[in-house]
């Protein structure tokens, strides 16, 4: 006959409460980052719609306006943050995000790209 030493159930409850808080914070972070992505993409879409209305038709292949370039950069940064948080939560399929949020290819391609002068320098 094998005997098990007694164990406290209170540890299980504490771990369960901690696990619940961690999952709750992960969900809240995903929600905040998803909203930030939606906001950034909406700003880009509004700019593009206004630009088409101003120019009276479909897009013409021209160099990117600095304001639009900033909007694409903001959207790609928001996308990158959202993808990283999802991966930290164990959600690895990015294609779902791209379809659900209707992320333009140019935003996808700039995801995770940072300009050399925008990086913080660390002192050594």
Q: For each predicted feature, which ranges?
A:
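Long, compositionally biased, intrinsically disordered regions
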Residues: 1-2, 31, 99
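Short, charge-rich amphipathic alpha-helices with coiled-coil/heptad character
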Residues: 2-20
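Short, charge/polar-rich alpha-helical segments
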Residues: 17-35
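Peripheral, non-catalytic segments of secretory and membrane proteins
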Residues: 20, 54, 112-114
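Non-transmembrane amphipathic alpha-helical segments
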Residues: 33, 37-51, 79-82
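Amphipathic alpha-helical segments
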Residues: 49-71
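Amphipathic alpha-helical packing elements
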Residues: 65-112
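Short, charged, intrinsically disordered terminal tails
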Residues: 110-124
């Amino acid at each position: 006959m094998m005997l098990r030493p007694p164990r406290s159930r209170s540890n299980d409850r504490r771990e369960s409460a901690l696990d619940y808080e961690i999952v709750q914070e992960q969900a809240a972070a995903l929600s905040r980052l998803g909203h930030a992505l939606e906001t950034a993409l909406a700003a880009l879409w509004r700019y593009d719609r206004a630009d088409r209305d101003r120019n009276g038709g479909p897009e013409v292949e021209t160099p990117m306006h600095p304001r639009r370039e900033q909007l694409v950069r903001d959207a790609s940064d928001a996308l990158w943050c959202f993808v990283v948080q999802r991966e930290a939560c164990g959600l690895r399929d990015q294609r779902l995000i791209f379809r659900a949020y209707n992320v333009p290819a140019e935003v996808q391609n700039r995801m995770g790209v940072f300009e050399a002068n925008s990086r913080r320098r660390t002192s050594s």
